[in-house]
Every structure is written in C-alpha cells, then in structure tokens.
Curated annotation (Swiss-Prot):
Cofactor note: Binds two Mg(2+) per subunit.
CDD domains: TOPRIM_primases
Function text: RNA polymerase that catalyzes the synthesis of short RNA molecules used as primers for DNA polymerase during DNA replication.
UniProt xrefs under HAMAP family: DNA_primase_DnaG_arc
Classification via SUPFAM superfamilies: DNA primase core
Comp. bias regions, Basic and acidic residues: 292-303
Domain Toprim: 171-250
Organism: Methanocorpusculum labreanum (strain ATCC 43576 / DSM 4855 / Z)
Assembly with partners or alone: Forms a ternary complex with MCM helicase and DNA.
Record-given protein name: DNA primase DnaG
Keyword Transcription: yes
Cellular component aspect of the GO annotation: cytoplasm; DNA-directed RNA polymerase complex; exosome (RNase complex); primosome complex
Catalytic class of the enzyme: transferase
C-alpha cells in the first residue's frame, strides 16, 4: 500500500471501464497516457523513481462485463503540483482495449490526519501525565502562613505545656485538650491557646485561669467531659465550648471553630446544673441562674482593659436588648393557681396566659402580641418573622433546632414549658421555663 510517514497528499480516483480489465491495464494506462503530457518535471515514471509519488494502488471489480473501482496515488509534491497531476489523470479515456472514465473524488491532506492524531494524543497526555492541579496565589499564601503559625507553637511552665505564642500576654485564654488542638487553632489564627495534656490539670493552667478570662474548648465526648469536670473544680473557668457531635477540635474547620466559640456557655450557669451521673455535653440547660451569677461573669469580662489576643473576626457577644437581662425564674405553684390575666402586659403574664393552651404566642419588644399560632405553624413561620419580634412563648417542649432558629432570627428570649436536648445556649438568647 503506502506509508503516511513521508507523503503529504493522497489522490482518490474513481475508475469505470466499459469491459473487463485488469490492474496492470489500469497502471499501464496511467503511465502511458500521461507520459510527456506534463513535461519532464512531472513525468510519473521519474517521480516514482525519485520517491515523490508512491505506488499506484488499484482496487477494481469486474461484474456484468464492466469494471469499476478505486485507485489511490500517494504524493509528496506540493499542493499545486499534486492538483496538476490529479487533473492530468482525468484525461485518461481508455484502459486496455476498453473505453473508460476516470474521475478524481478528492485529494486528502494526510498532514491534517497527523494534526488530528497529535491533538487527540496531546489531550490524552494532558489528562494522564499532569496530575497536579494548578495552585492559586491564595493557596500558596495560606500554606505559607499556616506553616509559619505551626512553627510558632511554644511551651510554657515547668510542665512544658503546648501553647500559642500569645497565651502569656493575652487577657483571655482558651484551654484545649492536646497539642494537636493547639496546632489546629493556630492554623485558624487563634494563638492564645494552651493544652492541659491529660485529665490532671497542671498548676500552670490553674494559675493562668485565675488571672485571665478563660474559655474551655473540649471535645463533646467522655474524655472532654472528664477534663471539663476537673477544670470546673480546680480552675477559674468563665466559659465552656464544645466541638460538634462526633468531631474533635483538632479536626474542625475554621468556620466550625468560630461557631463553637460563639456558642460558648457561661461556666457559672453550667456549674449549677451538673449532675455527677450525667455527661456535661448532654446537659439540658434549664436556665435558672440569678442576676448575681450572670452579672459576676459580665463584671470579670468588663474589668479587662486590654483587648484579648484572639482573631479580629471572632464574633463579639450580641448587643444587649431593651429587655432586662435577668433570667426569669420558673413560675411557682402559687403563681400557677392565679387566674389568667385578661390583658397580659408582661412576659410573665403572657406565659401564665398561654399555659395549658398547647399553643404559642409571638411578642414584640414592648410585650405586645403579634400573633398566636399552633406549634407547627410557629415552626413554619419562624424564619419569616419580621425584625420587630422580640421573643416567643411556646406551651410545649422545644429542642436545640428550635433554639438555633430563634437565635438566627435575632430573638432575645424563648419561653417554653420544657427544653429538651439543649446542649448549648447561644449567647444573648434567654431561655425561660414556665
């Protein structure tokens, strides 16, 4: 046949003869009837001897006294010379003893085939050989910054506890379980952390907690529960934060860490609810703390003049609303026996009015009624409430999902006859049992 390694074009020729002819007749007609037609430079015999055209490939079939088929001639001439040669072949009118007609079907550019093969192979090589995904400038900067933060981890005290570089200078510290937790918080830009490295609380941590605003950030499992119980007994803890369920602090993303620290719980409230046989992370926070406990934590926070060395974008505590921040205690038995007020004007009167109704009420800042709904209706409209809503009263049990939705909507209090499965109380949202 022919090779596409050295040729440029392939001439496709269609042959029809009025009789039975052989392949040798076709080849002879091509050489014989074009000889001297185009001059010495385009003589087919000379071109074939010099390798500028290939072998003449003839594929014909004789049937019913006629012959038809195809013929292929490979050419390494330029386009103009190849076109002239192809046009000359169409002048052939006899093959052997028979009348014949030759027609050029097309001239195929074999270099275009090579180009298509190159493109397809390049695509395969691009997918197979270049595995590494291009890295952006942001990714490079993030990787370098994280590496520098990891290098800044230090040790403090005679126990050589892993800690962030700013733990001694900062007015606020975060106590975590181990070195891996310190490293992860450093990657997130939080450099005022210290690890206890076990269930026995080191003296260095106890001393720091007495001088600084202290938050404990532990896993929500048995190990974190044991560490937290001892810290609450021997150290001066202000706030407690938990990792999400089935997640460790060392594996959390920056977004998860910020969210957990935002939802920290005052330790003073936590201490008054601890039962020895109940995991702290599973505790239902029925807020019954008095004004004195709540204000003592606030005074300690306000007494620090220096801004804590924590990331600038960590959320601040929500601003206080016009409603008194004292937690409303549960209604006593004597109050329950009172006649329901016809026109309630306070939150406590509204809770008394809604008790045993099985419904819910939405209140404005001035304790005015916005609307009464069933619990299912309230859950449906809660995300759509207007900004003038201050709180809700529910004569039913509410869960953590409801509390999270209320906090996200900006409510300042939720009153209910029971709180079930509450593992964290968002800062600034009061839970009022009745």
């Amino acid at each position: 046949m022919y090779s596409i390694d050295s040729i440029k074009y392939l001439i496709h020729i269609h042959i029809e003869a009025e009789g039975v002819v052989e392949k040798t007749d076709v080849v002879g007609a091509i050489f014989g009837q074009t000889e001297g037609l185009l001059g010495e430079e385009l003589d087919l015999r000379d071109l074939q001897r010099s390798g500028r055209i290939g072998r003449i490939d003839v594929q014909i079939v004789s049937k019913h006294g006629k012959t038809a088929g195809e013929c292929y001639i490979a050419s390494s001439l330029d386009r103009a010379e190849t076109a002239i040669l192809a046009a000359a072949l169409e002048t052939i009118d006899r093959i052997g003893p028979c009348m014949a007609a030759i027609r050029i079907q097309n001239i195929e550019d074999l270099r275009a085939i090579k180009r298509r093969q190159i493109v397809e192979r390049a695509k395969e090589l691009l997918l197979e050989s270049f595995d590494e995904v291009g890295i952006s400038t942001y990714d490079i900067l993030t990787e370098v910054r994280e590496a520098s933060r990891v290098e800044k981890i230090t040790t403090i005290g005679p126990e050589r506890l892993p800690a962030g570089p700013a733990v001694l200078e900062s007015d606020a510290i975060i106590i975590v379980e181990g070195r891996a937790d310190v490293l992860n918080l450093l990657k997130c830009g939080i450099n005022n952390t210290v690890a206890v490295e076990g269930t026995k609380v080191p003296e260095t941590v106890i001393d720091l907690s007495a001088k600084k605003n202290t938050t404990v950030f532990v896993d929500g499992d048995r190990g974190g529960d044991l560490i937290l119980r001892e810290l609450l007994q021997v150290a001066d803890i202000d706030f407690v934060a938990f990792s999400p369920r089935r997640r460790s602090v060392e594996d959390m993303s920056r977004k998860e860490i910020v969210k957990s620290l935002r939802n920290k719980v005052p330790a003073s409230v936590l201490k008054s609810h601890i039962e020895k046989d109940e995991p702290i992370s599973d505790l239902v926070f029925e807020i019954e703390a008095g004004e004195e406990e709540h204000s003592s934590v606030s005074q300690k926070e306000e007494g620090n003049n220096t801004t804590p060395d924590v990331p600038a974008d960590l959320p601040e505590e929500p601003p206080k609303s016009n409603i008194d921040e004292a937690i409303i205690p549960p209604i006593t038995t004597s109050e329950q026996n009172l006649v329901k007020p016809e026109n309630p004007h306070t939150i406590q009167e509204h809770t008394q009015y809604m008790k045993n109704t099985g419904r819910s009420r939405v209140l404005a800042e001035d304790a005015g009624v916005i609307g009464d709904y069933s619990l299912q209706e309230l859950k449906a409209i809660l995300p759509k409430l207007n900004d003038d809503v201050a709180g809700v009263i529910v004569d039913a049990a509410v869960d953590q999902k409801f509390i999270d939705q209320a906090f996200a909507k900006g409510l300042t209090y939720v009153a209910a006859n029971a709180f079930e499965g509450i593992v964290r109380r968002p800062a600034g949202l009061r839970l009022i049992p009745f």
